[in-house]
């Protein structure tokens, strides 16, 4: 298809990559009054989009990268929605010689923040702007309003801000209703999105463990689970997108069997890597994030389906049947879930704070909590409390030390511990619940047993140690066999 771009109205915004997220973001931008240009490597995909979803929209398609670039007004604003890694670099390398100083590229995929750092430096050196932008909200969020986490070239963000503010999710907030803010330079946006996904892993695993205890421990039916989760979603503590969709899931019937669909879904969870990246970053920066690690590990364990089935016939465990008051235990499970959730978010925010300090991102933690209130997968009512905690005390070292969260966890730790004991007695694995409680118990202790660890290190490797009766920074070595 040929057209004379010289006589066409220039497009305000361009999208490369027409998988469902790219399509939905293009439609979102167009619906806010911005003329769009689109391009996809496969012409068939472009033609299908133009013949179906783009009909009647102010969207123009290009069938070569050169035509696509010519369609855009300057400074060109190009959103790239392709698979992370090599495909992003390939698109950038194809665009670079066609762009002019001041033009900007936005990577809206789940790219590794280190790749975004490299791309930002490379493109800024040529006079181009680069924005690595985390996009959360899934297909629906992309279309109706996602949570956006842009980082990179500040000047490029300023050009994009009027568009991003309009396409982002909108929430009730006295500071700013749009769920978008400039996260910081370089890979800051993709870093925060990575940690968002890590927290998401933690949230999902904690909910799965609560479900396991309620269903396989207390014996609740799917109808009862639907009712309980619906009630939980009305509470200040647990009101969230993930609890809301879990409520819907328990009610969904399977058209093939007539039974509940949840009972026919294989217990093997997939993952795309952002949870693993979060865990690796936590280790590299020295920030403990055990709940998130447990959640990633739980998905890995779930993938060993055939191996687990074989092991189940050989390795026995407790066979206790619950005989207590079910109604009395449901609120205890709710409290355990909330306490664990607080720990998971505390870990994620601590990791962002450390990365911000280490990489010079200057991340505004209250703003992060604000933009996660709408559009994104981890949106939850208690994010207002997280925002307030960091706004009241910008130097807060850990979310658990904020007055409200401290009191909440202290008030609920009794039921939390009871639920873990019950799970252990019944042989129900609760790795994320357990890791959360271990995190709390470790963080609140002034003295841990790592004095023995350090003594062992000095014994076999002369790694030295500090003494409790001497100032920090003085190191000692002992000849242990003398």
Curated annotation (Swiss-Prot):
Q: Which reaction does it catalyse?
A: 6-phospho-D-gluconate + NADP(+) = D-ribulose 5-phosphate + CO2 + NADPH
UniProt xrefs under Pfam families: 6PGD, NAD_binding_2
- Enzyme Commission number(s): 1.1.1.44
Gene Ontology biological-process annotations = D-gluconate metabolic process; organic acid catabolic process; pentose-phosphate shunt, oxidative branch
Q: Pathway, per Swiss-Prot/TrEMBL?
A: Carbohydrate degradation; pentose phosphate pathway; D-ribulose 5-phosphate from D-glucose 6-phosphate (oxidative stage): step 3/3
**What residues bind NADP(+), as annotated?**
17-22, 40-42, 82-84, 110
Which molecular function terms from Gene Ontology are attached?
NADP binding; phosphogluconate dehydrogenase (decarboxylating) activity
PROSITE patterns noted in UniProt: 6PGD
* InterPro entries named in the record: 6-PGluconate_DH-like_C_sf, 6PGD_dom2, 6PGDH_C, 6PGDH_Gnd/GntZ, 6PGDH_NADP-bd, 6PGdom_BS, NAD(P)-bd_dom_sf, Pgluconate_DH
Per the Swiss-Prot or TrEMBL record, the active site comprises 193 (proton acceptor), 200 (proton donor)
Ligand binding (substrate): 110, 136-138, 196-197, 201, 272, 299, 457, 463
> What quaternary arrangement does the UniProt entry report?
Homodimer.
Name of the featured protein: 6-phosphogluconate dehydrogenase, decarboxylating
Task: Look up and give the organism this protein is from.
Answer: Synechocystis sp. (strain ATCC 27184 / PCC 6803 / Kazusa)
Q: Its gene?
A: gnd
